[in-house]
Amino acid sequence: PVLAIALVPLVLNWPWATRSYDWSARDWGYNLLMSVEPYGVLFTNGDNDTFPLWYAQEVEGVRRDVTVIVTSYLNTPWYARQLRDLTTPCPSGKSPDQDPTRVICQRPYDASAEAVYTMTPDQLREGQIALPLDRPVRPPYRPIIDLDDDAIERVMSSYIMMDEAQSVVVGEIEALLPAGGYLYPWHQLGLTIINQSITDRPIYFASSGNAASELGVQPYLVRQGLAFKLNNGDLNA
């Protein structure tokens, strides 16, 4: 009888607690990925805003060309190495799908998703909005982290105290870092990724996190669907 009491919450809560036919997380992940231009880099905050994206990519095959970066994981060397390797352009004769257990190089943009970047009357009626592209779709020519294993390990052991505010130039952007805190490894790698990728790939931040603010690049963001795109330069120029 005592153990049966434990079943009471299950029975009473099941009708509203079940996730059957609840597609909100899946749809949110799909829409966020489809807010990003081909071969984009997308910074997320943590598990809750990342796992729906990974599900969409790995289970449904949606926008596998997008590199999802979990900022809370960037403080670990294995994750930095993984990002470097999976964004490295594939050498001639090598396919990113040849190893079923891991991603070994940059996965290609799937042209079957091109309907997102054009607009027809049917799409407009269905609420689909085209994303304007400012350049032709082309594969990236370099990884997002161009550091060897030793350099990555050195970054992981570096915690910089910000005694005073500093500005860091990344591309045509001036990132403003406030005083009074620490510059953690993920901050350093995040700025490195932006600096190395801003002319090679579109860079985005999920609307669910504050990574752009912590990296000091928030004034350069433009809303695009469920993501914020980082503009390489002054928005008012």
What positions do the PLM features span?
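ER/secretory pathway lumenal C-terminal domains and tails of membrane proteins involved
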Residues: 1-41, 51-237
